[in-house]
Swiss-Prot record:
Main localization of the protein described in the UniProt heading: virion
Glycan-bearing residues: N69, N146, N238
Protein name per Swiss-Prot or TrEMBL: Outer capsid glycoprotein VP7
Maturation and modification: Intramolecular disulfide bonds. N-glycosylated.
Source species of the chain: Rotavirus A (isolate RVA/Human/Australia/Hu5/1977/G2P[X])
One cellular component (GO) term of this entry: host cell endoplasmic reticulum lumen
Leftover remarks: Some rotavirus strains are neuraminidase-sensitive and require sialic acid to attach to the cell surface. Some rotavirus strains are integrin-dependent. Some rotavirus strains depend on ganglioside for their entry into the host cell. Hsp70 also seems to be involved in the entry of some strains. In group A rotaviruses, VP7 defines the G serotype.
Residue sites binding Ca(2+) 2 per the record: Q177, D228, V229, D301
């Protein structure tokens, strides 16, 4: 009898000891795994670079802070600012430290060192198609060219607004524009655009559908054309397909974190499509053309006034001028 009781007690003690050993083993194993995992993270973290809105930029977020060197007495909202300029500016200045100089000057206006980025572009036409506007605020310097005033206003329309575009097969189909935000955008080295409006029987109105020479010419030998026709009317379209492409586009809305500073020219560009409205010049400003150093000094002086007519960061993160839908 006593032997059975002792055996039971011994079995219980052995079970407790074994359970304690198993729990300690599991705990040590988990500690080992967690330690190795944390060690691995610590070792690889210096080599891992995450993307901020599609580009390696140190986005600082939104932090209210007062900067003693700021000329503004109000707390400045820390943000990122991208300044886009023609490559000719850098070539004329010819100073390896010019960006650092400008950064120091922007600091006096409340922009901390490292919050302003400078990016050059070679061709405004190419830039407008895919501008890559990633900062909280984006300011584009566009040199005025009196030989392409119409192109410049249309380029500004592309940069300041977001567009959703579809390819068009004008050899098989006719098209119509459904609203004022619906436009046909043509690009190429030489774009001549002709249209023939159609009636409900698909017969030409004032033109013959079988003879492109009777079509109305809406653009001739241009690099960029934003075609606006009568809404709700079908049109046959003819373009120089070897040197030009055309897309059916809808304007989604303004990029309110983008502004254009026109350098030179008698008047600021007007990109308003509706002739009954006040010209849309709030985010298009003009400064007199001088040497590029003088242009940048003027930009620094007025940058905070420019920012006041903008909104921080557009709804689009990778803000390309076109969104293609295939």
């Amino acid at each position: 009898m006593y032997g059975i009781e002792y055996t039971t007690i011994l079995t219980i003690l052995i079970s407790i000891i074994l359970l304690n050993y198993i729990l300690k083993t599991i705990t040590n194993t988990m500690d080992y795994i967690i330690f190795r995992f944390l060690l691995l993270i610590a070792l690889i973290s210096p080599f891992v670079r995450t993307q901020n809105y599609g580009m390696y930029l140190p986005i600082t977020g939104s932090l209210d802070a007062v900067y003693t060197n700021s000329t503004s007495g109000e707390p400045f909202l820390t943000s990122t600012l991208c300044l886009y300029y023609p490559a000719e500016a850098k070539n004329e200045i010819s100073d390896d430290e010019w960006e650092n100089t400008l950064s120091q000057l922007f600091l006096t206006k409340g922009w901390p060192i490292g919050s302003v980025y400078f990016k050059d572009y070679n061709d405004i036409n190419t830039f407008s198609v895919n501008p890559q506007l990633y900062c909280d605020y984006n300011v584009v310097l566009m040199r005025y060219d009196n030989t392409s005033e119409l192109d410049a206003s249309e380029l500004a329309d592309l940069i300041l607004n977001e567009w959703l575009c579809n390819p068009m097969d004008i050899s098989l189909y006719y098209y119509q524009q459904s609203s004022e935000s619906n436009k046909w955008i043509s690009m190429g080295t030489d774009c001549t655009v002709k249209v023939c409006p159609l009636n409900t029987q698909t017969l030409g109105i004032g033109c013959k559908t079988t003879d492109v020479n009777t079509f109305e010419i809406v653009a001739s030998s241009e690099k960029l054309v934003i075609t606006d026709v009568v809404n709700g009317v079908n049109h046959n379209i003819n373009i120089s397909i070897n040197t030009c492409t055309i897309r059916n586009c809808n304007k989604l809305g303004p990029r309110e974190n983008v502004a254009i500073i026109q350098v030179g020219g008698p008047n600021a560009l007007d990109i308003t499509a509706d002739p009954t409205t006040v010209p849309q010049v709030q985010r298009i400003m003009r400064i007199n053309w001088k040497k590029w150093w003088q242009v940048f000094y003027t930009v620094v002086d007025y940058i905070n006034q420019v920012i006041q007519v903008m909104s921080k960061r557009s709804r689009s993160l990778d803000a390309a001028a076109f969104y293609y839908r295939i």
